Amino acid sequence: MSNTATRLTSHPEEAAVRVPLELYMRGHAEDSAEHMRAAFMPTARLESVREGPLTSWDLDTYCQRFNNTPAADEATRRRTIDTLDIVGTAASAKVTLVHGSITFTDYFVLLKTAQGWKIANKAFHAQVA
């Protein structure tokens, strides 16, 4: 599901920063709002420009898209953590999700909170092959 074995930085927090990203990818794989809620801060926004207008969801709206029914083609889907940049209590990450003919490129801002690293915001683009 992810490239968890490949270190992208020498930062001592890398493993901890990966936790919410891997929860996010697992949430997609299992179609699980529970995993998404564990990955994101409750105040997170998820945004993209799709076919012109801005799409902007709060976490509750985003989680309504998940109903614990993995996609029929789940076995063929790929998800990778491509880049990580970590400085102090802030980080950014790029994740690629290949879901059939659609490739999603996700950019995340993460923060180290009292509950550990969490995704603060996500901006994404969907490209149809």
Regions from the PLM with identified roles:
Residues 40, 97-99, 123-124:
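Short beta-strand segments enriched in hydrophobic/aromatic residues
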Residues 27, 98-99, 108:
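Amphipathic, hydrophobic secondary-structure cores in small proteins
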Residues 12-16, 45-103:
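Surface-exposed, charged secondary-structure patches
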Residues 17-18, 37, 89-91, 117:
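Generic alpha-helical hydrophobic packing signal
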Residues 2-5, 57, 118:
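Terminal "cap-and-tail" regions of soluble proteins that handle hydrophobic small molecules
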Residues 1-34, 38-42:
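Short, low-complexity N-terminal intrinsically disordered segments enriched in polar/charged residues
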Residues 103-129:
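Short beta-strand edge/turn micro-motifs at domain boundaries
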Residues 10, 35, 39-42, 53-55, ...:
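Residue-level signal for alpha-helical context at structural boundaries
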